[in-house]
């Protein structure tokens, strides 16, 4: 969500404080440009499993050289709720794209689609940002009958996969072919 390009896994000894024990080992990995939280979590699980095995072998062999954790200010992640996972279409397109990837597969970024005076809750699963001039007011939906696009302040967002309330996830093409719509996000 915040544009980090690298992440990793750490093994450490537990002490009386949360996340303050001595570091045993660490492995880093690059966050891929189109990677969402679900895909990244799968990669980190595998990386973490390998690191746990290496750590246990080091402990068993008595070859552990720990380092203290850096003394940094504690930052608690906000609890994800419906109120703070709603898309803000007036944001920078790169921020919106990262927000969607960071909340995928759960809890999912969402928006409200307006269609002929009716508002529908809609989860957004996959988007692609196209930088350029602002075509319409941010949040306005436009289409060429093949792609569902939303105007943002510095270009447009292609909404590739979405899920209307009480429906299965679908591509934008499936939505455009299956529904009569006059949309606004």
Map each language-model feature to its residues.
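Donor/substrate-binding cores of folate-linked one-carbon enzymes
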Residues: 1-83
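Internal anion-binding site segments
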Residues: 71-185
């Amino acid at each position: 969500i915040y544009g980090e390009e690298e992440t990793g896994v750490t093994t450490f000894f537990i002490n009386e404080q949360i996340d303050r024990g001595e570091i045993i080992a660490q492995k880093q990995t690059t966050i891929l440009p189109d990677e969402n939280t679900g895909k990244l979590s799968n990669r980190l699980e595998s990386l973490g499993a390998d690191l746990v095995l290496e750590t246990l072998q080091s402990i068993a062999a008595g070859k552990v050289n720990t380092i203290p954790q850096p003394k940094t200010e504690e930052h608690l992640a906000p609890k994800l709720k419906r109120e703070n996972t709603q898309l803000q279409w007036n944001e920078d397109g790169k921020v919106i794209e990262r927000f969607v990837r960071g909340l995928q597969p759960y809890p999912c970024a969402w928006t409200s689609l307006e269609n002929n005076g009716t508002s529908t809750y809609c989860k957004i699963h996959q988007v692609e940002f196209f930088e350029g001039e602002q075509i319409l007011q941010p949040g306005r939906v436009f289409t060429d009958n093949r792609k569902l696009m939303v105007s943002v302040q510095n270009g447009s967002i292609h909404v590739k996969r979405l899920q209307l309330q009480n429906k299965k996830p679908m591509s934008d093409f499936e939505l455009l072919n299956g529904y009569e719509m006059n949309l606004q996000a």
